[in-house]
Amino acid sequence: IFEVEPCGSTLRDGDVGELAIFSYIDGELDFTDKKVPMDLVKEMGTIGASHGWVATLKNGAVRLQDDLDPRASDTDPKRISLPPLVTLPHCQTQIVTNVAMSSSSPEDEECIVAVKFMGPQLSLCRPAQRDCKWTNIRITDPSFFFSHVMYSKRDEMFSMPASGGNYTGSWDLGRHRHKPKLQMLWYPEQRMVKDRLFDSCSRMEYYLVESSETGETFMVKWFTERNPRRKGRVKWEYFHVLRLDKEGNAV
């Protein structure tokens, strides 16, 4: 979690600010000497982040940059422009759900960048390859149209949960490019009964997360209830985290 305090401007980046990182150890903001473009912290400044890299979208092209990585140089930041996006018929490439990468740097030869757009389109590319171009996948199952994508090192595939969290879909650049690998998820009856209590929530979102330490996959359920009498302010939030084994059992 970061914060940026305005501190001036530069010819290269315009308005800039000092990067501060929230420390979970002491509960305080730790200010760094790193200066970053203020454009990156605007509401529509970025479309996603992965492994410390942030992605921006401008004029139909995605750019990856390491400005918000406190370990990266602010005098010589890395900024990698990807090929212009190609919009599939009856799809859109202006509203992005999120961005994921298969490795820690887009400069790695085998790194694959995935951009999940709201709707049916999922686009993949290898930035380090000389003839880098987008591979566009049309998702046919509407249950994935609003899902967030993540990369599984264990399975070497990009995966996302279906709406409702009942199953997952996984894609790659090989045989699962057009036909995703689907896996049903099985929840304990007691947990299903408890989750039904949140069926009336104003917001329910599902995310897949993989542990970099153990390779285990987790399903994160995020329930939000808003108070209409207080201009829609959040009344309460509830997070539920479940570990998924290789057979799809949630524990």
Regions found by a protein language model. Name each.
Residues 1-62, 67-72:
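A non-catalytic, helix-rich entry segment at domain boundaries
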Residues 23-26, 88, 129, 243:
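Short acidic, glycine-rich loop/turn motifs
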Residues 28, 130-133, 246-249:
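Structural alpha-beta junctions
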Residues 41-232:
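A sequence/structural signal of beta-propeller blade repeats
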Residues 229-251:
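Structured C-terminal portions of repeat-based eukaryotic scaffold domains
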